[in-house]
Structure formats: C-alpha cells, structure tokens
C-alpha cells in the first residue's frame, strides 16, 4: 500500500496515520497496530507528502489529558516523528488535548500544524473562525488545510460563500471536502457515534460501535428508507471536479477497510470514474453493500449537478426518492460484496 501511495504522490495532498498510542486515540476502531519504527520506515517512502498524525478522538479521559507523564509520552512520539522528518502536524477534535500538549512542550508544538478534524463540523465561517481563534491560544501553527463539514457537499452556495470569505481572511489555508463517507444527511447519531468510538478506544472490551449502528443507528435508517443511500452527502469520483475552485483537495476515508480496498477507492477518485456498486466505494454505507446495489454507472449523468446545491432540503424535494425506486436494488438477502 505504501508503494502504491508513493507511485501516486503527485495526486496526494496529505496522508493521515494513527499513532497507535494507548493514551491518545484516533477516531477509528479496528485499525491494526504498527510499531513506531515501522511507521517511520513507511512514511519515509512519501518524502514530498504532508503527513498528519491522527489524534482526533471526540474526547479523551481526564486522567490522560491531566496527567503530565501521559502527555509527555505522546509528545515523545511526536518528537521522534518530527526528528525523522515524518510529521508536519496533527489532526485533533478534542481542544482539551490540544492545550495539554501545547502547555507541556510549546517548542515542539510550534513546529506542528494543528488541523481541526472533519468531526469538528466546520459548516460556517463563524465556526471556522472561532476554532482558529481558540487554536491561536496554543503554541501550534495554524493549519495549512482544513476539511469542511459534510453538509457543504450538497450546499454549493454556502460552500462558495465560505470559500470566498476564507480566501480573504486566511489566504494561505486550503479547503477540502470529505468525499466518500456516506452517512445520513445531518446525521442525528453523529455525536453519539463519535463518543461511542471514543469509549471503545478507552476500553476495547466495551467496543460495540458496529452493533449500535446496525441495530439502532444509521444502518437501520438506510434499511428503513433506502432513498437515504442517495440522499447521503457523498461526492462521486465523476463529480468532484465541479467543486473547484472552492476546494483544493478531497479527503477519502476508510482506513479500517484495509489497504486493498483503499487502493481501489483512491484509484477511482484519481481517475474520476467508477463502475460498480456505489456502496462499496463509501465508508459507512459499505456495511450494506451485501444487501443493496446502486450501479453508479447507471445513475443520471447530471446526478452531481442536481444534488450539489440541494442544501439537503429533502423535505421539499423528491429527486433522490424517485431515483431510489429505479436505481436502488434491495436484494433482500445477504450477498457477498464484490470487494469483500
């Protein structure tokens, strides 16, 4: 996988990786652990790519953020990565953690960007501005890029307005969108879902995120109303070009699905085309790819154009519901996904 990324460095704005630290979590479960030496060895194969460590759990237990020894252990790992030339910044969601790191080693933090994670839900200029203002109270450098909230994938007017104002206020900061996390529109489960992941990272024996999603959460909603699969604010490979120049990069998710599948996801977005079950391209919706099929190549050619400025006002529109009747196939039984 790392050699594949190296061959495609020209297409990469940045890469993200977990520290696999027991006191500082990322926002994913089920990611295989790698020793720091192996991580550095792999990252050195990407010399021209900006590298960010994921410290983006929704929250951390107070005993981690208030304990100087535990914070120092995290900082030691960051220092090792910086010295190896393999780290330019961190991705965070928990501001308590950000301040704890900055207070303990401001000199190190002054060499690192602090990038608000996509789960900070940056959907407006005031929200962006206040996050950056809070960041200014730490030693960290301002981010060179941020990823905006998923809702803006389907609200082009708001996106263009934010992009225009951001260029005036922060001319050196690039904007991006998360392309392939196919969750519910303005997902009501989002904060609880993130918190469930955080709790599972603190105590892996209590990890129940997938069971919660399938029995009580978003996966259950998709089964109840399959039109939500199309109403989800994803960006297809064929449609991302239309978002320039408001954004300068896209983020692709799915680390827990493994390197083989991530290679395919990245390749389809590089080539701006995909033929197959749309759900297999998506992170989250892939849970349902063994039951539902949406042939991406059969969707209307203007699907992206029709949905990029709908503002997710599904209460006043039937476009995706009508499409779902023709394009969402419910097999009714579990089948093995093509990418399994």
State what each model feature region is.
Residues 1-131, 142-251, 255-340:
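Active-site pocket-lining/capping segments in soluble small-molecule metabolic enzymes
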């Amino acid at each position: 996988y790392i050699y594949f990324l190296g061959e495609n460095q020209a297409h990469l704005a940045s890469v993200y990786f977990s520290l696999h630290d027991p006191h500082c979590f990322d926002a994913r479960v089920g990611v295989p652990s790698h020793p720091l030496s192996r991580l550095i060895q792999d990252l050195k194969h990407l010399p021209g790519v900006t590298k960010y460590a994921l410290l983006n759990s929704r929250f951390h237990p107070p005993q981690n953020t208030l304990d100087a020894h535990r914070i120092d252990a995290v900082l030691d790992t960051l220092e090792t990565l910086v010295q190896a030339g393999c780290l330019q910044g961190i991705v965070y969601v928990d501001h308590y953690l950000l301040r704890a790191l900055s207070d303990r080693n401001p000199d190190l933090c002054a060499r690192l960007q602090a990038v608000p994670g996509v789960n900070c839900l940056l959907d407006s200029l005031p929200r962006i501005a206040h996050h950056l203002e809070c960041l200014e109270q730490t030693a960290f450098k301002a981010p060179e890029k941020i990823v905006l909230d998923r809702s803006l994938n389907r609200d082009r007017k708001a996106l263009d307005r934010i992009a225009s104002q951001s260029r005036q206020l922060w001319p050196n900061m690039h904007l991006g969108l998360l392309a392939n996390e196919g969750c519910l529109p303005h997902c009501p489960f989002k904060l609880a879902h993130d918190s469930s992941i955080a709790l599972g990272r603190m105590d892996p024996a209590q990890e129940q995120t997938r069971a919660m999603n399938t029995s009580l959460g978003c996966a259950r909603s998709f089964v109840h109303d399959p039109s939500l699969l199309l109403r989800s604010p994803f960006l297809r490979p064929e449609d991302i070009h239309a978002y320039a120049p408001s954004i300068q990069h896209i983020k692709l998710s799915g680390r827990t699905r493994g390197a083989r599948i991530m290679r395919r996801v990245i390749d389809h977005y590089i080539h701006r085309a995909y033929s197959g079950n749309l759900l297999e391209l998506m992170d989250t919706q892939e849970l349902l790819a063994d039951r539902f099929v949406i042939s991406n190549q059969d969707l209307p050619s203007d699907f992206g154009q029709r949905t990029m400025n709908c503002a997710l006002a599904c209460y006043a529109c039937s476009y995706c519901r009508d499409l779902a009747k023709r394009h969402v196939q419910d097999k009714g039984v579990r089948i093995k996904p093509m990418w399994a």
